[in-house]
C-alpha cells in the first residue's frame, strides 16, 4: 500500500491534533488506500472550525469557508481541510438548505453517500469505520450509508456516483441500494447537466462501462436528461470503456440527430471532437487505398485514429465500418505518420497569396480547393514541398 501522499500530509493532521482537535483522512483516498489503488487527492476532516483552522495555519485559502472547507497550503501543496458537519434538509434533491458544524466524527461520516467512502483514518493509519465500509470493500459491495432512499432523496447525483463506482471499481451494488436507485432515478432530472456530465464521463471511462451502460438504460436514466431523451440509447452497444464524446458521436451518427450540443454545456473542444468523430465515421468506408489513408492520417492525426482502432469492437457493434483492415490498421497509420511530409497547412512552402500572385487572380472560393489539392499532392508525394515546384504544378493543374 502506498502511504506517500498520506505521509506528506501527516504534519497537517499532527498540527491540528497538537492544538487539541481531531483530524482524519477521509473519503476516496482512504478507500483507494485500503484497496491498494492509486491515490490522487487527500481530503482531511477535523473537529476544528474553519476559523480555528485559519488560526492554526499561516498559509490558508478560504475556498469554501461557508461550507466548512479551508485550503491549507503546506510544502507548496494544497490540502482541503473540512470541519465535521451535519446537513439540514436538502433542496431540489441536490443541495442542503444549511450546513451545521459539529465536533463529532460519527455525525460527519453518517451524512456521506456510500459506506466505502465513509471510512476515516488517522495519521497512524488506524481506521474509524462506523458503517462497515471496509467489510463492503472486501466484499466488493456498493451500499449507501443508512437508508438508501434518504441518501438519494438528499442528492440524486449519488445514484450516478454509485453506478460510476461500480464501473470503476468493478463492485456489485447492494440489492436494497439498487432498488432505491430504480425508485428514485426520476429525481436526476433536478440535477444540473454539468454535474451529470462529470459523473457520466467517469462512469463511461471505467473498467466495467460495458456492464454499467446497460444499467443506465435499465434504470431509464437517459429519459431524464433533455439532451439524451431524443436518442434510442438502448440501441447503442458499448464493448469497452469509452469517451463521452465518442459515445455522443455514435448516437448522433447512428440516429441522424441534429440536436444541439449546446444543451450539454460542454467545452468547445469537446463539441469539436464530437463533430470530428461524426465526419470521420462518414469518411471511413472510403479508406480503400494507401493514398486515401495518407490524407486521412494527415487530416485526423495518429492520436484520434489510434483511439478509433482501439474502439473497433464498439464501433462494429454499432455497425460503423472501419475500412479494409489491410489498409486501415495501426501499423500502416504509424508508418504513414512517421513519414508525413507536412503535418499542417502552414508547413507548405506556399500560401494563398503566393497562388494568387502566380496566377494573377483575385481570391474566391476556388482558392480553398486549390490549397487542399496542393496539400493532398504533397502528402502523396506527387510534388515536392518546394515553392517553385508547387507553383509550376498549380499552373499546369489548375483551371479557373
Curated annotation (Swiss-Prot):
Catalyzes the addition and repair of the essential 3'-terminal CCA sequence in tRNAs without using a nucleic acid template. Adds these three nucleotides in the order of C, C, and A to the tRNA nucleotide-73, using CTP and ATP as substrates and producing inorganic pyrophosphate. tRNA 3'-terminal CCA addition is required both for tRNA processing and repair. Also involved in tRNA surveillance by mediating tandem CCA addition to generate a CCACCA at the 3' terminus of unstable tRNAs. While stable tRNAs receive only 3'-terminal CCA, unstable tRNAs are marked with CCACCA and rapidly degraded. Mg(2+) binds at residues 41, 43. ATP binds at residues 28, 31, 112, 155, 158, 161, 164. Its EC number is 2.7.7.72. Belongs to the tRNA nucleotidyltransferase/poly(A) polymerase family. Bacterial CCA-adding enzyme type 3 subfamily. It catalyses: a tRNA precursor + 2 CTP + ATP = a tRNA with a 3' CCA end + 3 diphosphate; a tRNA with a 3' CCA end + 2 CTP + ATP = a tRNA with a 3' CCACCA end + 3 diphosphate. Keywords: ATP-binding, Magnesium, Metal-binding, Nucleotide-binding, Nucleotidyltransferase, RNA repair, RNA-binding, Transferase, tRNA processing. The keyword Transferase applies. InterPro entries: Bact_CCA-adding_enz_type3_sf, CCA-adding_enz_C, CCA-adding_enz_firmicutes, NT_sf, PolA_pol_head_dom, PolyA_RNA-bd. This is CCA-adding enzyme. GO terms for biological process: RNA repair; tRNA 3'-terminal CCA addition. SUPFAM superfamilies: Nucleotidyltransferase (SSF81301), Poly A polymerase C-terminal region-like (SSF81891). It comes from the Bacteria. The gene is cca. CTP binds at residues 28, 31, 112, 155, 158, 161, 164.
Amino acid at each position: 500500500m502506498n502511504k506517500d501522499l498520506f505521509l506528506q500530509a501527516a504534519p497537517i493532521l499532527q498540527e491540528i491534533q497538537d492544538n487539541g482537535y481531531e483530524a482524519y483522512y477521509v473519503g476516496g483516498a482512504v478507500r483507494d488506500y485500503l484497496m491498494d489503488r492509486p491515490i490522487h487527492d487527500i481530503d482531511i476532516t477535523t473537529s476544528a472550525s474553519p476559523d480555528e483552522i485559519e488560526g492554526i495555519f499561516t498559509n490558508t485559502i478560504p475556498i469554501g469557508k461557508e461550507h466548512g472547507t479551508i485550503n491549507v497550503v503546506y510544502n507548496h501543496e494544497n490540502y482541503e481541510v473540512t470541519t465535521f458537519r451535519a446537513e439540514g434538509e436538502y433542496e431540489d434533491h441536490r443541495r442542503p438548505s444549511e450546513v451545521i458544524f459539529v465536533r463529532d466524527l460519527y455525525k460527519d461520516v453518517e451524512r456521506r453517500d456510500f459506506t466505502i467512502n465513509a471510512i476515516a483514518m488517522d495519521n497512524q493509519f488506524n481506521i474509524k469505520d462506523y458503517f462497515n465500509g471496509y467489510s463492503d470493500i472486501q466484499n466488493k459491495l456498493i451500499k449507501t450509508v443508512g437508508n438508501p432512499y434518504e441518501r438519494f432523496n438528499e442528492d440524486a447525483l449519488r445514484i450516478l456516483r454509485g453506478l460510476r463506482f461500480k464501473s470503476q471499481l468493478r463492485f456489485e451494488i447492494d440489492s436494497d441500494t439498487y432498488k432505491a436507485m430504480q425508485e428514485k432515478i426520476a429525481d436526476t432530472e433536478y440535477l444540473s447537466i454539468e454535474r451529470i456530465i462529470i459523473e457520466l464521463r467517469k462512469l463511461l471511462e471505467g473498467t466495467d462501462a460495458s456492464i454499467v451502460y446497460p444499467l443506465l438504460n435499465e434504470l431509464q436514466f437517459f429519459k431524464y436528461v433533455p439532451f439524451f431523451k431524443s436518442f434510442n440509447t438502448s440501441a447503442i452497444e458499448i464493448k469497452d470503456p469509452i469517451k463521452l464524446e465518442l459515445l455522443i458521436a455514435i448516437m448522433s451518427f447512428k440516429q441522424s440527430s441534429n440536436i444541439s450540443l449546446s444543451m450539454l454545456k460542454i467545452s468547445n473542444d469537446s463539441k469539436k471532437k464530437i463533430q470530428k468523430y461524426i465526419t470521420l465515421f462518414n469518411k471511413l468506408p472510403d479508406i480503400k487505398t494507401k493514398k486515401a489513408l495518407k490524407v486521412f492520417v494527415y487530416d485526423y492525426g495518429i492520436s484520434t485514429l489510434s483511439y478509433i482502432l482501439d474502439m473497433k469492437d464498439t464501433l462494429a457493434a454499432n455497425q460503423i465500418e472501419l475500412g479494409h483492415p489491410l489498409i486501415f490498421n495501426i501499423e500502416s497509420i504509424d508508418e504513414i505518420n512517421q513519414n508525413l511530409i507536412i503535418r499542417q497547412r502552414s508547413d507548405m512552402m506556399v500560401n494563398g497569396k503566393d497562388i494568387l500572385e502566380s496566377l494573377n487572380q483575385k481570391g474566391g472560393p476556388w482558392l480553398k480547393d486549390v490549397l487542399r489539392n496542393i496539400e493532398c499532392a504533397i502528402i502523396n508525394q506527387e510534388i515536392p514541398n518546394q515553392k517553385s515546384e508547387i507553383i509550376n504544378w498549380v499552373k499546369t493543374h489548375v483551371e479557373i
